[in-house]
Amino acid sequence: MAVSAGALAFPALSVRATLNPEIKDEQANISSTTSSSQKFTYSRASPAVRWPHLNLREIYDSTPSQTLSSPVSPIAGTPDSGDVVDSIASREEQKTKDETAVATRRRRVKKMNKVALIKAKDWRERVKFLTDKILSLKSNQFVADILDARLVQMTPTDYCFVVKSVGQESWQRALEVFEWLNLRHWHSPNARMVAAILGVLGRWNQESLAVEIFTRAEPTVGDRVQVYNAMMGVYSRSGKFSKAQELVDAMRQRGCVPDLISFNTLINARLKSGGLTPNLAVELLDMVRNSGLRPDAITYNTLLSACSRDSNLDGAVKVFEDMEAHRCQPDLWTYNAMISVYGRCGLAAEAERLFMELELKGFFPDAVTYNSLLYAFARERNTEKVKEVYQQMQKMGFGKDEMTYNTIIHMYGKQGQLDLALQLYKDMKGLSGRNPDAITYTVLIDSLGKANRTVEAAALMSEMLDVGIKPTLQTYSALICGYAKAGKREEAEDTFSCMLRSGTKPDNLAYSVMLDVLLRGNETRKAWGLYRDMISDGHTPSYTLYELMILGLMKENRSDDIQKTIRDMEELCGMNPLEISSVLVKGECFDLAARQLKVAITNGYELENDTLLSILGSYSSSGRHSEAFELLEFLKEHASGSKRLITEALIVLHCKVNNLSAALDEYFADPCVHGWCFGSSTMYETLLHCCVANEHYAEASQVFSDLRLSGCEASESVCKSMVVVYCKLGFPETAHQVVNQAETKGFHFACSPMYTDIIEAYGKQKLWQKAESVVGNLRQSGRTPDLKTWNSLMSAYAQCGCYERARAIFNTMMRDGPSPTVESINILLHALCVDGRLEELYVVVEELQDMGFKISKSSILLMLDAFARAGNIFEVKKIYSSMKAAGYLPTIRLYRMMIELLCKGKRVRDAEIMVSEMEEANFKVELAIWNSMLKMYTAIEDYKKTVQVYQRIKETGLEPDETTYNTLIIMYCRDRRPEEGYLLMQQMRNLGLDPKLDTYKSLISAFGKQKCLEQAEQLFEELLSKGLKLDRSFYHTMMKISRDSGSDSKAEKLLQMMKNAGIEPTLATMHLLMVSYSSSGNPQEAEKVLSNLKDTEVELTTLPYSSVIDAYLRSKDYNSGIERLLEMKKEGLEPDHRIWTCFVRAASFSKEKIEVMLLLKALEDIGFDLPIRLLAGRPELLVSEVDGWFEKLKSIEDNAALNFVNALLNLLWAFELRATASWVFQLGIKRGIFSLDVFRVADKDWGADFRRLSGGAALVALTLWLDHMQDASLEGYPESPKSVVLITGTAEYNGISLDKTLKACLWEMGSPFLPCKTRTGLLVAKAHSLRMWLKDSPFCFDLELKDSVSLPESNSMDLIDGCFIRRGLVPAFNHIKERLGGFVSPKKFSRLALLPDEMRERVIKTDIEGHRQKLEKMKKKKMGNETNGINTRRKFVRSK
């Protein structure tokens, strides 16, 4: 719980206004001890100033030295009874010539007559001399000793000043002086002396003594108005208005006419007795005027101070306007009070305007003025303005006083910058020499308590006690609240007990906090005892505490105490049965609550809407809906004519519990509230506000229409909400119309946020002209646009990219005000970014710096974000470096932005450095950043680091989200590990997270590539069963899987499902179907699909023809394929790269030379003779031509160049044109068809990645790579790593598995490459073994690729179970695989492959037999070890 607003909300501005009388006394003690030399003077209290037409003059001149301002607020300086006494004394000085001197002793320093004494110039010295003597007395000495000594001759007027001067330090010594004068009969008690002593006692809150003296002196001087005024001042200080009123009546009975001071004092008493009710200020002013007097500045200042104390802005404005209307000149106090009330009400701009007006009217701001303005900006947490005001305050010669420190400390506390607040507190004690007061400690303790730093708060309390400052009630309450918030119940109880022991009487807040702590800690018995104490002290708990108490009593079944509590609520709190029922419901005492409500209705209580809503809301929140319905039935029976009210209450109840859908159903269903029987404005407003809060703007618009149709007047809050609604709906014109209508009805919005919303809505609609007109209308109506309005207009320009117009507004603000802020600068830069003129950002920034603006961190971040959105990593890094050099430390948002940009740009090293830098700066890496790293590593296929990042996420305690799981699943899919991805998806579902559709698609595709058809189909069916709307790509993916499995029936079924789902097949869809027919060996079915396509109006390309032709060529029906080619030619379609690739690929798999020539001759006939010319002889002459074709194909989509070159390399390798294949492969690298680092032989980086290569291309690349590594092994440079990795992948390319093909080749050569144990699709060799093999193996003696002298008659390669293998190796390969199966090492395979068939069979038999014998021997050895173990154990068994 927080300390009450009255206690801590404004500790720095108004000490006396916010503390109770006891705290005022303590504050007065502090002020008297810390700053006794500073005395506040008020010139208008002087009679010569107040009544210049009487030509009065002071007996003494004012001190020429500059008077210091009081370190209190404008409210603290309000003219009270003490100031009134000073004013009386000034007036009485004119009458001292007529006063008779009392008898004096003969001992005189110098004989003077009365006139000489009055005219003496050294009266100040006499008063000061005697005052110092009296105040220097010890506690056991008496004033009489000084006065009897007659050290200096004094007049009665002098003694009055002595009483007042001594009373400033000690009321006891002042009373001694007064009593000594009475006992010695030195002078008769005149009105001036009595007024003086009453003023002293009033200041020290010695009311009883003041009453006694007044009663004793009244018969003698009772007809003097100043005595009554002084006594009224005593009552005024304690807020006893009735007593002051009685004195006014007594004055009139005695014939003493009250003067203006009397009424000012009476007004002060009335305002201190209670808050400023509406129109009370006007009534009090009328009271003064009805008495024939004219209110002066003190009258108005008293009222303004009360308004400031209560934060009553409307009242203050009315008083100030009345003051100006009656031509009463405002003074410095007036402006101080108005600045204070504006600051308290959060209108710092108005406070600043008054401050400027004050200086223009010739007043000089004092410390109170600056502190009030300082507080106004501090309340808005405007640190820059606070610094600006403080610097101006210092320039004017005012240093930091206690109020200044308290204000800034309070601001830092509200901002949560407690370290700065504590540092300021230390500076206050050390550097400035100011002594912290009770307010300082209270503010710090309250701020620390709210931040759960209760240990430091308790230490401050101890320090406060050590320096002799008594904690106030608010101090104790703040610490108790801090303990309560931190859940430290025992410490809160100890503090409360300490407060009681110190004599501080708890107020309602202290009792309430402790009661709340005990009740929430289930200490019901202690809470009950404290509650009884609270009741006995005259305090009553709030409704909420009663609810908690009843809840606690219910848990312990203390029904008697519940009944007592109900009686207290009824008798002490005056709660009616309806209110008691509401409390009981919230305390879960439902039976008694229902009984109370029924009693209320039976007794004739009128059912009130708010009460009914409270009860029903409690039922609803506790889930007791049946009881709520029963209650409504009772109300329908016993509360006649309440049907509409009950329906409205139900609607409002639904709104209160935020059940908007039910409220709308009830609203639209019942014609009593929605139709011609109109509802209440409360129901409309509640439903409308609920719709706005839940962002149901369309329904809110409907409710607003019904409200206007019903004739209900829209309130100001409704108009504001509807402006928001129409702006959110994108109807700024309608919103503008609502504002115009509201202003016609008398609502005055000034430059409220509504105009800002309208201007911003116009900006979002790109209607900057209308946004401009809104501001123009405001200016024409005499309303000066404020900073937010100008910024909104600039933002509208920025949305449209109108930089020049935004700059014009910026220049207007520079010229006419208000001064542009950081937000204004950011909007200006944003306009430049939207306009696409990023290159001009630096120029504008330099211009702003030349104008004196400091570019803030937010502006730099805006520029950085703009370049980041543009993907300009260079500029982003430059700005980032400059920002760090300027001292701006990066924030978590900046790190997130930078890392996301670097990850999108795949700047791996930079991203890793940024993450490390972030961790070194003690920032916790957010999940979003880790997700960006996951995406980057997945994109670059660094799956090892992807897994490491996921492990880091779990180690740091972060919970992976949907993005994390989706990225990881996609990573597993790309890494050919769909089973692990599926398990992760299951884990994701168990956590309540839904995978994205793209994740499902990747997983289905991965299962298809792994030939896991059942899992892929299961996932697809699962998506369909969920009713999700799948796009065309899902069906295409499943059709590709069906194609690869050779199941054309499934492809047909998928096509039908696709049509049933409302997705029209495209040309690509039909191509997939035809390829499925081709894979299953049904080219005729594929041709039927093509015929059907011809009958439609679809414009055909070579894609469907290539599918049909490829189907015939795969089934070895070359003639039919050629016929379809010629048909396509006749139909006007020119064959392209798809057709060429089909024929070249088919030629590479043809077994005989004649078949190859047949296919290539067909291509030559249609105008593409490059393949046949490469095979015809002297292919080296065609290098430039081949390069030209590759360049043309590279620009075509669908991997045209890659597919064609792969097929061509297959053909060249198969028919032993391997030198030609070598330079064709290198041309492919040159043109970017193949990756530049398809194989690498660099320093400590030997590796290759042959994925995306065909079988022939992979064999060419392998030979070239081995040749490069052999050269490096012989020369010793580049140095090899510890192991060499060859990535083959697990996919098949047109029926060829690279993994199987490369294994067969390397195993035949006896290479040291072995399969990776942890990942499939990888071959790994130890570098040392690889180098030795390259140097010594006979297979590596000649790795140069050469062309055959003549084209062989048959294909040198064969395709066996996905393995593109040398045809001569096929018998040995099949024999070894059949006999040994499983894994055979490369060396063993190479040795067996070279043997004749019979010898190979004997060697295999011998190997199998040797392996069997080895296993038997190992089994016997194991059994022997077990037997030895048994004997060994028996050896140590002791015999009996």
Swiss-Prot record:
Major subcellular location class: plastid
**Targeting presequence:** 1-44
Family matches, as InterPro entries? Pentatricopeptide_rpt, PROP1-like_PPR_dom, TPR-like_helical_dom_sf
Ranges occupied by PPR repeats:
224-258, 259-295, 296-330, 331-365, 366-400, 401-431, 437-471, 472-506, 507-541, 542-572, 608-638, 643-678, 680-714, 715-749, 751-785, 786-820, 821-855, 856-890, 891-925, 926-960, 961-995, 996-1030, 1031-1065, 1066-1100, 1101-1135
Q: Which UniProt keywords apply?
A: Chloroplast, Plastid, Repeat, Transit peptide
What GO molecular function terms would the record report? RNA binding
Source organism's superkingdom?
Answer: Eukaryota
Q: Which PROSITE patterns does this entry report, sorted A to Z?
A: PPR (PS51375)
Give me the stretches of Polar residues compositional bias. 63-72
Compartment list: Plastid, Chloroplast
Q: Name one GO cellular component term.
A: chloroplast thylakoid
Give a GO biological-process term.
chloroplast RNA processing
Annotated region described as Disordered, given as residue ranges? 63-84, 1419-1440
Q: What does this protein do?
A: May play a role in embryogenesis.
Q: So what family is this one in?
A: Belongs to the PPR family. P subfamily.
Designated name of the protein: Pentatricopeptide repeat-containing protein At3g18110, chloroplastic
Naturally occurring in which organism (per UniProt):
Arabidopsis thaliana
- Its encoding gene is what? EMB1270
